[in-house]
């Protein structure tokens, strides 16, 4: 297993699953707030609260999905069947969520809440097994980095395809009828996402076998929570997605009201996405050269500095804004695949500590905190815009609203990146030397007794 080299076809196949997820995820992150406030016509404050409350359901659905996936037995494996058979209902609900039925004001609020909640549930059904799949395709740390690098290059391409093409599709399909355009645009993208998920199913294979679970769901949840490195990566995941969600969700408002033209949005977003593609491709060579944890925290520190600097860019300095967003795009997507590899490492760490490989529930918990970050980001945008007096129908916005939009686009992400750098530097201990020692022991069948798991100390010599 350790020496198995993954084929390019399988890496592409796995990456297609991430591309499909990002077609929907990035679209929701960038457009759904705008769609609800400016197209469907519901208040920004309500949308923010709805985003946050929907996560309460995820607190139940995500771990349940992970536990269910861990206990799945089929001829296709544990995780792959969920990817294929969840894809069609996922795509259908995406279209419903972006539809604008003729309803009363209260009817619109109920419709938005129901369809958005269904969308998050079906995202869970597809994406938790997909995330866990990366941990069972191979247990080779180098191959995992390569797999995740391919995944995030294709994920970035999928997100770029979705977000850059969305407005042209809206205009082509709907013309002046933006409601029809959004519905038709997401329908086209949902079909593409389904085909990608099917390709992922047929080209990947689960190789890392875990013994059948003999413990209860409650015990599995307890063991995951006791994994201190999983908790650290969970916090890093919230901060990472909060940064990108707030910046992404504010981008349409930023180009419209700060840069002065909504027409700049596609070019601005494309510049960011091109940077993302380059960043994804750089992750593997950089982590071959330097410990991935060091790359992670140094990059986050640099992102914090750049984000603060962007706050002071004059409103009429368009070229400077494009340069900043390109560099930020490169650096942000450089750390994202590293973070997912770190999550896979925490699964191995948990197995090394207590002999239990809890891949599904581990990634379920990660997806929950990821969606929590998404919800917090959406809620923060909605609440801050509402607090600043944002008026979607106005021709100009007041100075408080403009300052809030700039802060959402720059300072809020800066805080997230700074916290990520500090936490990774101080608390994440699964660095390359220790990982090599740990994986060698796992390969030999060495397991630490469960009673030692609470402390699970790491020798100082392996932390550096």
What role is predicted for each listed range?
Residues 1-464:
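Membrane-embedded alpha-helical bundles of multi-pass transporters/translocases
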């Amino acid at each position: 297993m350790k020496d198995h080299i993954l084929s390019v076809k399988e890496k592409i196949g796995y990456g297609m699953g991430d591309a499909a997820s990002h077609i929907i995820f990035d679209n929701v992150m960038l457009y759904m707030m705008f769609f609800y406030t400016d197209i469907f016509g519901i208040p920004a404050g309500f949308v923010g609260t709805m985003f946050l409350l929907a996560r309460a359901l995820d607190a139940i659905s995500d771990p349940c999905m992970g536990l269910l996936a861990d206990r799945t037995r089929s001829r296709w494996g544990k995780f792959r069947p969920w990817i294929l058979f969840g894809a069609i209902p996922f795509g259908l609900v995406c279209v419903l969520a972006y539809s604008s039925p003729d309803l009363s004001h209260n009817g619109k609020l109920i419709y938005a809440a129901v369809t958005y909640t269904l969308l998050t549930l079906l995202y869970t059904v597809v994406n938790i097994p997909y995330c866990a799949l990366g941990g069972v395709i191979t247990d080779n740390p180098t191959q995992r980095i390569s797999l995740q690098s391919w995944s995030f290059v294709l994920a970035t391409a999928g997100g770029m395809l979705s977000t850059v093409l969305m407005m042209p599709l809206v205009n082509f399909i709907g013309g002046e009828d933006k409601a029809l355009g959004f519905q038709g645009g997401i329908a086209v993208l949902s079909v593409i996402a389904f085909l990608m998920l099917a390709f992922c199913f047929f080209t990947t294979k689960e190789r890392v076998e875990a013994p059948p679970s003999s413990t209860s769901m409650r015990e599995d949840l307890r063991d995951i929570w006791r994994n201190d490195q999983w908790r650290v990566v969970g916090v890093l995941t919230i901060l990472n997605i909060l940064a990108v969600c707030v910046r992404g969700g504010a981008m349409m408002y930023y180009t419209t009201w700060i840069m002065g033209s909504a027409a700049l949005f596609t070019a601005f977003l494309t510049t960011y996405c091109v940077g993302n593609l380059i960043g994804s491709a750089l992750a593997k060579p950089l982590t071959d050269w330097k410990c991935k944890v060091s790359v992670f925290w140094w990059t986050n520190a640099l992102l914090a500095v750049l984000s603060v600097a962007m706050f002071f860019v004059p409103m009429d300095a368009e070229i400077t804004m494009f340069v900043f967003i390109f560099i930020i795009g490169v650096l942000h997507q450089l750390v994202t695949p590293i973070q997912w590899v770190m999550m896979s490492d925490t699964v191995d760490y948990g197995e090394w500590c207590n002999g239990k490989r809890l891949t599904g529930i581990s990634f379920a918990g990660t997806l929950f905190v990821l969606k929590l970050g998404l919800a917090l980001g959406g809620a923060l945008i909605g609440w801050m815009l509402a607090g600043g007096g944002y008026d979607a129908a106005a021709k100009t916005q007041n100075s408080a609203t403009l300052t809030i939009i700039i802060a959402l686009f720059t300072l809020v992400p800066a805080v997230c990146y700074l916290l990520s750098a500090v936490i990774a530097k101080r608390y994440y201990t699964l660095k390359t030397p220790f990982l090599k020692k740990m994986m060698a022991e796992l390969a030999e069948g060495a397991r630490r007794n469960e009673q030692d798991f609470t402390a699970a100390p790491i020798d100082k010599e392996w932390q550096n």
